[in-house]
């Protein structure tokens, strides 16, 4: 009976350790993807120079503002 209890305790410790490592990897992945998104947004703003370009729809402009020309 004592061996069973010890085995259950060891299994619980191993499972909780595994869960901690998975959580850490998930947080690292989220941080990495968030950084990529932020970098892409910065780059888009940096290279966005369509002001006074003719347009028909807002999505054609960097700032999504179209009144015949991008604003």
From Swiss-Prot:
Kindly state which keywords UniProt assigns to this record, in alphabetical order. Cleavage on pair of basic residues, Disulfide bond, Knottin, Neurotoxin, Secreted, Signal, Toxin
In terms of Pfam families, this protein maps to: Conotoxin (PF02950)
The family database entries (InterPro entries) matched by this protein are listed as: Conotoxin
One Gene Ontology cellular component annotation held by this UniProt entry: extracellular region
Q: Name one GO molecular function term.
A: toxin activity
Is Chloroplast one of the keywords? Answer: no
Which positions are cleaved off as the propeptide during maturation?
20-46
Q: Which locations, inside or outside the cell, does it occupy?
A: Secreted
Q: List the disulfide bonds.
A: 48-62, 55-66, 61-70
Q: The organism sits in which domain of life?
A: Eukaryota
KW Acyltransferase (keyword) present: no
Show which residues constitute the signal peptide.
Answer: 1-19
Q: In which tissues is it expressed?
A: Expressed by the venom duct.
Q: Which family does it belong to?
A: Belongs to the conotoxin O2 superfamily.
- Domain notes, please? The presence of a 'disulfide through disulfide knot' structurally defines this protein as a knottin.
List the protein's name: Conotoxin PnMEKL-032
Source organism? Conus pennaceus
